[in-house]
Amino acid sequence: MKRVLTATALLMATTGLASAEGSLQLYNWGNYTSPELLEKFTAETGITVTVTDYDSNDTALAKIEAGGHGFDLVVPSANYVSIFNEKGLTVPLDLAKLPNHANIAPEWKDVAWDAGRTTSIPWQWGTVGIAVDTAIYGGDINTSAVWLEVPDELKGKLNVVPEMMDIVTLATKYHGGEPCSEDLEVLKKVRDSLMAAKPNWVSMDYGATEKMANGDWAASVNWNGSSMRIRLERDTVAYGYPKEGYPLWMDSVMLLSDAQNVDNAYTFMNFIMQPENAALISNFARYANGISGSEAFMDPVMATAPEVVIPEEHKAAGFFMPTCNEKSREYMTAIWTELMK
């Protein structure tokens, strides 16, 4: 789920030696698709890729449900894969057309949200945590207290990404609840703490990579890859893993049921499961990818990056976000709607 978002953009790779013809429409999170990957794909296949950005799983879901979108592939987070499938918006994959499916790492091949990987393939995976400029705040950053009980040093300087599932879930874990909670006592604490904390936030925005790197913001609830990109430009920034609990996520590529360029979609999916090509995505976005052998082609700084390689002492607090039922989503949406007013 997760990334640094920009306004809608069209990234088109147009050069190359055509061994195939046509185009491909990819609907993906913003600032998440390597231009080098697209250029290489077009050079090798002759297929032109157009990437359209979205800013949240719910935005993508609503756009696809509305129809008439023209997209072939979408990249939802793990807890939305079953939703896309159940609504008939995506179709099972013909694995015979994906020989590189064998390159999916064993731990990502038979996952809870897609048994046997029959409807989705890995794009990137990571965590939700807190990026903090330690030159401004020197306290404990491995706690959601940083953004729910904002210390004086960070008041008016801390951003929160406007991602309902991530934010409500982090707050729920902080108050001792579980993901997708229907416990009204816990949810009241979540609602009250979010509303009390909001006046101390500078914004709820997706621009942490740029605004923390240039010093405009001092902290942000953020995704790990974005946080690494910030640190590479501003070395006083560190990434915290909330000890109360933090979500892990994986974004996966899915074939839409109304795709117009199905053959080209399969060509692209197979292409990105080649280790050296999966590494191009990771080197750009700064997340891990779930493809065996890709490590050999990745930027060496990622091999030891604390944002990418979860430190041993923080592993136990991580959990994969389940797909919430309708009632729990209603509760979260009610909290979120009030928070966003």
Name each region found by the language model.
Residues 21-84:
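Early extracytoplasmic/lumenal segment of secretory-pathway proteins
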Residues 70, 75-216:
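Extracytoplasmic ligand-binding site segments that recognize negatively charged/polar headgroups
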Residues 80-83, 213, 219-236:
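A ligand-binding cleft/hinge motif common to bilobed small-molecule-binding domains
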Residues 85-92, 114-118, 229-241, 303-306:
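Ligand-binding "clamshell"
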Residues 103, 187-195, 233-259:
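Periplasmic-binding protein-like
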Residues 129-136, 172-174, 250-261, 269, ...:
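A bilobed periplasmic-binding-protein/Venus flytrap-type ligand-binding module shared by bacterial periplasmic
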Residues 210, 312-341:
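Conserved C-terminal helix/tail region of periplasmic/extracytoplasmic solute-binding proteins
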Residues 256-316:
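Mature extracytoplasmic/periplasmic domains
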